[in-house]
Structure formats: structure tokens, C-alpha cells
């Protein structure tokens, strides 16, 4: 009798644990630039306030950085780290690939999707591989309409409250950055080696991208998506920023479209079971 009761209690505990198990989802999104409209009356000359950058998760930055590192390993000169001192001492051109380097800022235009290895787990939030996308046909549809896709990505994530859910940092499109300036100073130590003789200091403005912003997805009975995306564009000699800010309640499995005079977003949140 005790054995039967113990088994019943164990079964109840397993059932309770299963009922309260954390659900996982995957989101896929495409962001694209809208066609210029000469009838547009909205004024984007006022620069929007900086976004609240709390609880940030830089999935895309890490993914694009891995993409740049792979290009370096494949022999791309743009992404190779030049070893100036080794070149002087050996008389030969030398370069290396450092997995800890910042390869993202070496892109003039970011790829449409970051290159990541396909994963299947529920350990932490991670990016989708291109083979796990469902929206490839929509990219072609946008291009046929003359629209320019800036980013096609997705990630898997557990259900979290509004307070705990991270803000996923979004970057895409071409780079907007001021040119670098350099100053060279000679070290005072007369016994310095060649590699330490000169101190080259780089003064560089922060790199910005055509598409930047944050997306947060949290669960409270329903799925809620908070979208704050900035699109930079050229207006004569000026660079303007148009912001899309939307808060949307969505259902898993439905395809949703966020509209803005300068920017469009298509996304779908799907249930994920490993």
C-alpha cells in the first residue's frame, strides 16, 4: 500500500512539474526599408531620444562578429588583423584572425542574416540558422515589389515576464560612421623596442547602423512584443532617424506586420518543442 501511495505521489509531482515547465518559442523576423513616398507629411527632423539600454542581449552583434571571423579565416583581407610590427621585422605582409576582435565594424553593409551554427536545445537564448527559417519566400516577394530587406533573423527563447525578458539588440543594413582620425606620439623611453617606439592612438566615432534598436518579447497569458527600431536615412546632406515604437499582443503561429512610413517588419512567433 505504501508503495502504491509513493508511486501516486511521484506521478503527481511529475505531472505538476510538467504542467509548470517553461515553454519555449522561436521568432522569425524580416525588417525592410519602405519605398520613398513624396506624399509623406511626417517630420523626422527631430532626433529621437536615446533608447533605454537596460537588460540588453547582443545576439545579432555576436552572430555578425562570428560571420566576420569566418570571413577572416577564409582569407578576406578586409577582415584580417594586420600585424604591422611583424611585417616590419620580417619584411613580409602578415595578418591574423583573432576570435576576440571586433569584426562587426569592418562591414560596410551587414549581411542580411548572421551566419551561425544550427542548434537544438533549451539551455539559453540563441539565434536561428538560415536552414531554420520559414520566410525565405517572403524575402523574394519583397524584392519583387522593389523593397529592400535589411535584416532576416530569428531566435529561440523561453517564456519570461516583462521584468525578466531581455531586450534583443537589433542591427542591420549599412554602416553610418564618421571617419577615423589618428595621432602618433613617440615614447619618451629611448630604450624602447621598435614595437613600443610609437604609440598610435585612434579616435573613432561610435559605429551606427542603418537599422538599430531593441525588441523584447514577454509572456503574460499572451505574447507581447515591444518594438523600438530606428532607421537612419539620408536626407540631402543630413542623416535623419525615423523611429518605430510599437507594443503588440500577438498569438503564436500568426504572421504579423508592423507598418511605418520608413520601415516595415514581418514576424512570426512559433511554439518550439525540442
Regions picked out by a protein language model, each given a short descriptive name:
Residues 14-18:
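N-terminal signal peptide c-region/cleavage motif recognized by signal peptidases
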Residues 246-274:
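A cross-kingdom marker for long, charged
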Residues 1-7:
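Bacterial N-terminal signal peptides that target proteins for export
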Residues 9-10, 267:
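Feature for long, exposed domains in two main contexts
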Residues 1, 74-80, 94, 263-274:
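Generic hydrophobic segment detector
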Residues 21-242:
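Extended, low-hydrophobicity segments enriched in charged/polar residues
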Amino acid at each position: 500500500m505504501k508503495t502504491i501511495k509513493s508511486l501516486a505521489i511521484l506521478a503527481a509531482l511529475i505531472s505538476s512539474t510538467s504542467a509548470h515547465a517553461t515553454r519555449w518559442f522561436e521568432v522569425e523576423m524580416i525588417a525592410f526599408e519602405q519605398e520613398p513616398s513624396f506624399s509623406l507629411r511626417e517630420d523626422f527632423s527631430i532626433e529621437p531620444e536615446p533608447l533605454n539600454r537596460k537588460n540588453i542581449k547582443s545576439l545579432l552583434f555576436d552572430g555578425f562578429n562570428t560571420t566576420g571571423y569566418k570571413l577572416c579565416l577564409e582569407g578576406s583581407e578586409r577582415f584580417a588583423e594586420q600585424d604591422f610590427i611583424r611585417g616590419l621585422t620580417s619584411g613580409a605582409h602578415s595578418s591574423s584572425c583573432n576570435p576576440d576582435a571586433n569584426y562587426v565594424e569592418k562591414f560596410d553593409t551587414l549581411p542580411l542574416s548572421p551566419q551561425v551554427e544550427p542548434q537544438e536545445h533549451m539551455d539559453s537564448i540563441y539565434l536561428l540558422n538560415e536552414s531554420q527559417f520559414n520566410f525565405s519566400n517572403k524575402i523574394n516577394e519583397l524584392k519583387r515589389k522593389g523593397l529592400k530587406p535589411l535584416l532576416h533573423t530569428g531566435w529561440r527563447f523561453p517564456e519570461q515576464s516583462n521584468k525578466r525578458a531581455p531586450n534583443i539588440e537589433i542591427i542591420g543594413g549599412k554602416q553610418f560612421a564618421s571617419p577615423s582620425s589618428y595621432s602618433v606620439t613617440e615614447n619618451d623611453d629611448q630604450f624602447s623596442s621598435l614595437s613600443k617606439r610609437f604609440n598610435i592612438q585612434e579616435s573613432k566615432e561610435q559605429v551606427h547602423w542603418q537599422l538599430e534598436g531593441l525588441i523584447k518579447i514577454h509572456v503574460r497569458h499572451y505574447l507581447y512584443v515591444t518594438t523600438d527600431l530606428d532607421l537612419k536615412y539620408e536626407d540631402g546632406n543630413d542623416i535623419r532617424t525615423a523611429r518605430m515604437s510599437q507594443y503588440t499582443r500577438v498569438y503564436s503561429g500568426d504572421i504579423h506586420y508592423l507598418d511605418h512610413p520608413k520601415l516595415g517588419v514581418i514576424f512570426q512567433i512559433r511554439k518550439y518543442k525540442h
